[in-house]
Amino acid sequence: MTKSSELYQKAQQTIPGGVNSPVRAFNGVGGSPLFIERADGALIFDADGRAYIDYVGSWGPMILGHNHAVIREAVIDAAQRGLSFGAPTEMEIAMAELVSELVPSMEQIRMVSSGTEATMSAIRLARGFTGRDKIMKFEGCYHGHADSLLVKAGSGALTLGQPSSPGVPADFAKHTLTATFNDLDSVRELFAANKGEIACIIVEPVAGNMNCIPPVEGFHEGLREICDQEGALLIFDEVMTGFRVALGGAQAHYNIKPDLTTLGKVIGGGMPVGAFGGRKEVMQYVAPTGPVYQAGTLSGNPVAMAAGFACLNLLKEEGNEKRLASKTKQLADGFKSLAEKHGIPLVVNQVGGMFGFFFTDQETVTCYEDVTKCDIERFKRFFHLMLDHGVYLAPSAFEASFTSLAHGSKEIDATLEAADRCFAIIAAEAK
């Protein structure tokens, strides 16, 4: 038995399922999860001392690579001055100014401690600003585990085969309308049936919680137009796409200006940070300037702000955005080419520094229904084969994977060499 397996058994005695977030349990792929001891650059090292090329990146935050020296020193320096004050700091101003510089639609910003907190707060704000109760999301998209959002949710809920969660009252869920991603007609139908009642649309601009699904041409433009016509706010949930799809997020990549944006993951440089922000007139409704209450003991934590500030300043250096997208495209194209070589039907999607692949003979995968038609069992087999070859992909067919600036030619080439061997095994098994 490996040390990871031993630790997993031990963890289950005191931690539900042995993990502190469900997807980590490997339920989506089977087997025992790896317990990680340390990480550096593009590599993670498990409790047994084995190294893996990492394409999970702590589920997205590690865009510069693991254990980056500059971020590490920023954390140490901040920690030496105190871990938490519960009072304003100058670094919070610097951080807000930097985020607003990179994402201009965020004229004002409120820092929080997680992506879930950010989306939950943004939706409360949208309801308070518009005076409406209903919200619209998309099937297969995931916006955190707030009660009103666990309605046909993606990510962990899809991985576990549970489209909604027990414990969410029907009275909460009834205010959440669910449309079809990449289908504007479904959006229009819901607005027509709920005239003057919908406060906002919240959307992952690239759906990263049913693997990786970009918008079809005109989808986001259509959402913007519909929201303007109906007096609803458009919320881009950029917890995953922010600073990763492009330096200015998916909204910069697709040239769309949302009313509100939520951020997480990359913004903290590996520390627990989230944020929401947008038009000043909307953000002025947040307490203490407005009536919509939102608060947090650790919001704007000085150590977390220092990590995020260091991360974003490094990330915005010239050439980094293009370099990240280029190496991710190289990897995605390589997966597609190798699958074709071995006669394995595969759809590969990639935007900026995120990518995903689907074992399917469909020409495209553009919505949740398409995802459900993919070969999940084949994904599980491929995942474990790649793991055996030293490559750590997201342990779920419903999760996107991520590259970092620390992934160089050596890591990309080694990954594709492993994929070549793994596709060959799968092709042989299918004969």
UniProtKB/Swiss-Prot annotation:
Please provide the record's keywords in A-Z order.
Cytoplasm, Isomerase, Porphyrin biosynthesis, Pyridoxal phosphate
* SUPFAM superfamilies to which the protein is assigned, alphabetical: PLP-dependent transferases (SSF53383)
Which top-rank group of organisms is this from?
Bacteria
Q: Per the annotation, which location comes first and is thus the protein's main one?
A: cytoplasm
Q: Name one GO molecular function term.
A: pyridoxal phosphate binding
Q: Where on the chain is N6-(pyridoxal phosphate)lysine found, per UniProt?
A: K265
What GO CC terms are in its UniProt record? cytoplasm
Leading EC class: isomerase
Residue ranges of coiled coil: none
To which pathway does this protein belong?
A: Porphyrin-containing compound metabolism; protoporphyrin-IX biosynthesis; 5-aminolevulinate from L-glutamyl-tRNA(Glu): step 2/2
* GO biological process terms, semicolon-separated: protoporphyrinogen IX biosynthetic process
Q: Which Pfam families match?
A: Aminotran_3
E.C. designation(s): 5.4.3.8
Q: Which cofactor does it need?
A: pyridoxal 5'-phosphate
Q: Which catalysed reactions does the entry list for this protein?
A: (S)-4-amino-5-oxopentanoate = 5-aminolevulinate
The protein's matches in InterPro entries, at most eight in alphabetical order, are given as: 4pyrrol_synth_GluAld_NH2Trfase (IPR004639), Aminotrans_3 (IPR005814), Aminotrans_3_PPA_site (IPR049704), PyrdxlP-dep_Trfase (IPR015424), PyrdxlP-dep_Trfase_major (IPR015421), PyrdxlP-dep_Trfase_small (IPR015422)
Entry's localization field: Cytoplasm
UniProt record similarity statement: Belongs to the class-III pyridoxal-phosphate-dependent aminotransferase family. HemL subfamily.
The entry describes its oligomerization and partners as: Homodimer.
| Name of the protein this chain belongs to | Glutamate-1-semialdehyde 2,1-aminomutase
Q: Which organism is it from?
A: Vibrio parahaemolyticus serotype O3:K6 (strain RIMD 2210633)
